[in-house]
Amino acid sequence: MDRKMLKSKIHRATVTGADLHYEGSITIDLDLMEAADIIPYEAVCIWDVTNGSRFETYAIEGERGSGVICINGAAARLVAPQDLVIIASFVNMENAEAIAHEPKLVFVDDKNRMLESRKEVAGQATLKSVHWKN
């Protein structure tokens, strides 16, 4: 049996741009792509923490060290600069491999510089926690 598993995640990156007239994709700083083991043209899911939108596109490499996270094409209508997003990629693997699998999780600061790569802790609070207003 195959399972679809989280392969990698860039957690709470800040959107630096939204280019409606580019042909599609998400431009990601090459340093972050390498840290998260995401390659050019790999499918990625984008989850906008700020507004709740979710969509799938593909990654293209941005300038190394630039901190760029730019949503391109039609999906640019789903985000705004300064939104916080989670960028995730998935992989299918056999059950035995999936049991031992550990995804690459990359945590960034507000300038999209990598802070650390570590395991995710269930229920963990972050310094950037959103406080819901009624």
Swiss-Prot record:
Coiled coil: none annotated. It is found in: Cytoplasm. Its cofactor is pyruvate. It holds the Pfam family Asp_decarbox. Its EC number is 4.1.1.11. GO terms for cellular component: cytosol. Keywords: Autocatalytic cleavage, Cytoplasm, Decarboxylase, Lyase, Pantothenate biosynthesis, Pyruvate, Schiff base, Zymogen. Pathway: Cofactor biosynthesis; (R)-pantothenate biosynthesis; beta-alanine from L-aspartate: step 1/1. Catalyzes the pyruvoyl-dependent decarboxylation of aspartate to produce beta-alanine. Heterooctamer of four alpha and four beta subunits. This is Aspartate 1-decarboxylase. It comes from Citrifermentans bemidjiense (strain ATCC BAA-1014 / DSM 16622 / JCM 12645 / Bem) (Geobacter bemidjiensis).
